Structure formats: structure tokens, C-alpha cells
Amino acid sequence: MSEVQQLPIRAVGEYVILVSEPAQAGDEEVTESGLIIGKRVQGEVPELCVVHSVGPDVPEGFCEVGDLTSLPVGQIRNVPHPFVALGLKQPKEIKQKFVTCHYKAIPCLYK
């Protein structure tokens, strides 16, 4: 994740940016033994995310970059990947997905 930390994207105000790498439609499905059984028809909604950036108005010590949290479904907003925003890549070319939410929407932290 150190590569992710260097991307030109940061949270503002009381918001937190979360990042995950969910399986996408078209990804190969592989069994535990390594057999390819097809391609995903539909992408997945991740259960867990990593805190990528914490806004300056989030109370100090609430969470830190790198903390693991469950995805606060229903409380998130999509954030385009910086490479997509800069016109360098298409969304399907990037596995990392970013979302933002208010810090109070984060249900738990795994530390």
C-alpha cells in the first residue's frame, strides 16, 4: 500500500478516504488449487477498506492512515482514482477503488 500513499489525493474537512481492491467484472475466477473456472460477470462490493487519508477536521486519534475498517455501505461516495481524474487511465484499468465518508460513518476500526 505504500504506492497508494503517494497518490495525489487527500481528504478534506471531516471526511476520510478509504481504498480497497475489489474483484471486478471480467476478472478471472480461480479455485484454491489454481484452476481458472471462468470470468466474473459482476464486480464485488468489498467488506473491508483501508484508511488512505484523514481530513484535517477529523478528531485527532480517531483513525490513522493504514487502519482497516469495514465498508460503511450506504454512507459512502465514489471518488475517482487520481489517474482517472488526471486522464492518465480508464477506470477499468485500475484495480484500486476509492470512496469517501464522514468520519462518524465509520462503524469500526481493526487495529
Curated annotation (Swiss-Prot):
GO molecular function ontology, one term from the record: ATP binding
Cited InterPro entries: Chaperonin_GroES, Chaperonin_GroES_sf, GroES-like_sf, Phage_T4_Gp31_GroEL
One biological process term in Gene Ontology: viral capsid assembly
Keywords: Chaperone, Early protein, Viral capsid assembly, Viral release from host cell
Top-rank taxon: Viruses
Complex and partners: Homoheptamer. Forms a stable complex with groEL in the presence of ATP.
Function (record text): Essential for proper capsid assembly. In absence of Gp31 the major capsid protein (Gp23) assembles into 'lumps'. Acts as a co-chaperonin with the host groEL protein.
Protein name per UniProt: Capsid assembly protein Gp31
